[in-house]
Amino acid sequence: TLAFGFDQTSIIFFGIAGNVVAGLGAAIAGRLDDILGSRTIIIASLIGLIIAGTGVFIFADQGQITYWIGGLILCLFVGPAQSSSRTFVSRFAPAGREGEVFGMYQLTGRALSFLSGLMWSASISLSFVFGVTSNNTVWGIWGLMLILLVGLILLLRIDPNPKINFTK
């Protein structure tokens, strides 16, 4: 069967469109990052991702148009979340220790990357527990939304102007 009703050609076109939209989102958010701050952009992006992901789930039965519109809205918020996250980390990094801080940032991301696949699969498995017999793949969205929600909650606890003392 086709995932989300996309054949191979549709996936390629969606991938191209998604990257263009994510790039536009990152460019626009880059300007706003300087005005509003990285934390604000990341929070707005996470909220946008959660709302768009929920919309994709709710309107999944509308077919491929849902995945095109909802997916591109998701892409619009992915770019800013990624770019502003790097800016946010750079503002925390003390002079001369940027390599260490970004190394830890990258290590943490790689160490936790298994969570998305795990939560995707667990959510799909949960759909069977609820007796869903068709379009189970869409349920994977809930696992990803949960990860984003946890990230949002953790980010809200971070002081936007930390007083970090990195002494050796």
What are these regions (language model features)?
Residues 65-80:
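Hydrophobic core of transmembrane alpha-helices in multi-pass small-molecule transporters
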Residues 122-148:
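A membrane-interface helix-boundary motif in multi-pass transporters
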Residues 1-11:
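Short amphipathic helix-loop junctions that connect adjacent transmembrane helices
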Residues 80-94:
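Intracellular juxtamembrane helix-capping segments at the cytosolic ends
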Residues 142-168:
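Multi-pass alpha-helical transporter architecture, strongest
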Residues 8-9, 95-105:
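Loop-to-transmembrane helix entry/capping segments in MFS-fold secondary transporters
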Residues 24-38, 124:
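Helix-to-loop junctions at the C-terminal end of transmembrane segments
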Residues 47-62:
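C-terminal ends and interior cores of transmembrane alpha-helices
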